[in-house]
């Protein structure tokens, strides 16, 4: 029965701040008793259903730490951590772990692509006062919320609400719908990147890094794009070029951008021979493709 199934964190593709909570696991009495005697025998069951942080231990994009809401279980594929002190703020910890300094330290402790629980236990941690934790944590919370605002368009996510095409459909042509969604998507991604840059700078300050130390971190982890200076002329040129691509791009080009955002790939499960199709037919095609994610 469905009410015997619990939401299950099991890692997945690189995804920072939130997401990858697609699965459920049979936790009926019979199944639970079986799990107690086979496999890893549920050694961390006392932490099930608690709020925490989950992460992918390995992946092509590197480590990715995400907020774990209450009422979830987890296993080694979606390793998780939980607070044991009331004076430590969860969002501050999430911000630190997703900072360049956090990655730099983790990489130094384990240079492979597979970070272990033991590695994280060795990471030095500076706990500032409550106000500073809240100040830094607010940017992590914003990034969780912003990420969720995009995940709600993906049918495989438990927080799915509606397809982007249906959400943005105010008697517009379907290509205008895609234009609006892609512009909003890029805007939200830019806000996330900007928040990550702010978090980075604040973590550097909290850990009292010297300029030499900062240089070492940046040299290995790269500079956050939100810290890169942008001249007014460059910003204007980019916006003009981007809008020109959206307004004058082929139907196929715009469609592929949308599919990449929602589906994560441009490899489509079907061939489209006629791009000069009707709006209704294109909406159906989009629905078929994203439902196959």
Regions found by a protein language model. Give the residues of each.
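Non-catalytic, well-ordered alpha-helical scaffold segments
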Residues: 3, 52, 90-95, 201
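Non-catalytic DNA-recognition/assembly elements of restriction-modification systems
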Residues: 126-293
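Amphipathic, alpha-helical segments enriched in basic
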Residues: 2, 30, 49, 56, ...
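Noncatalytic linker/hinge segments flanking ATPase motor cores
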Residues: 50, 97, 120-123, 163-168
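Polyanion-binding catalytic cores of nucleic-acid enzymes and NTP/SAM-utilizing transferases
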Residues: 1-83, 141, 149, 185, ...
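Basic, amphipathic alpha-helical recognition segments used for DNA target recognition
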Residues: 46, 56-122, 129-146
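Residues that form generic nucleotide/phosphate-binding pockets
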Residues: 8, 96, 104, 108, ...
């Amino acid at each position: 029965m469905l009410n015997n199934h619990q939401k299950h964190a099991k890692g997945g593709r690189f995804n920072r701040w939130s997401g990858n909570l697609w699965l459920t696991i049979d936790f009926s009495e019979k199944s639970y008793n079986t799990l107690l005697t086979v496999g890893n025998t549920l050694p961390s069951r006392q932490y099930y259903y608690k709020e925490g942080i989950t992460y992918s231990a390995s992946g092509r994009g590197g480590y990715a730490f995400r907020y774990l809401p209450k009422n979830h279980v987890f296993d080694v594929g979606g390793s998780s951590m939980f607070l044991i002190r009331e004076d430590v703020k969860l969002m501050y910890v999430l911000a630190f772990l997703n900072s360049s300094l956090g990655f730099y330290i983790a990489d130094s402790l384990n240079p492979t692509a597979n970070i272990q629980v033991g590695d994280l236990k060795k990471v030095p941690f500076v706990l500032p006062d409550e106000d500073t934790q809240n100040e830094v944590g607010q940017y992590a919370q914003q990034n969780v919320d912003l990420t969720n605002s995009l995940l709600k368009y993906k049918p495989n996510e438990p927080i799915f609400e509606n397809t982007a095409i249906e959400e943005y459909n105010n008697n517009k042509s379907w290509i205008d719908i895609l234009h609006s969604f892609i512009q909003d998507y890029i805007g939200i991604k830019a806000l996330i990147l900007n928040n990550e840059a702010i978090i980075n700078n604040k973590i550097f300050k909290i850990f009292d890094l010297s300029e030499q130390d900062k240089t070492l971190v940046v040299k290995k982890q790269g500079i956050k794009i939100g810290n890169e200076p942008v001249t007014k002329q460059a910003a204007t040129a980019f916006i003009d070029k981007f809008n020109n691509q959206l307004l004058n791009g082929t139907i196929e080009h715009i469609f592929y951008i949308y599919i990449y955002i929602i589906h994560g790939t441009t490899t489509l499960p079907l061939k489209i021979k006629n791009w000069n199709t009707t709006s209704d037919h294109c909406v159906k095609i989009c629905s078929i493709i994203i439902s196959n994610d």
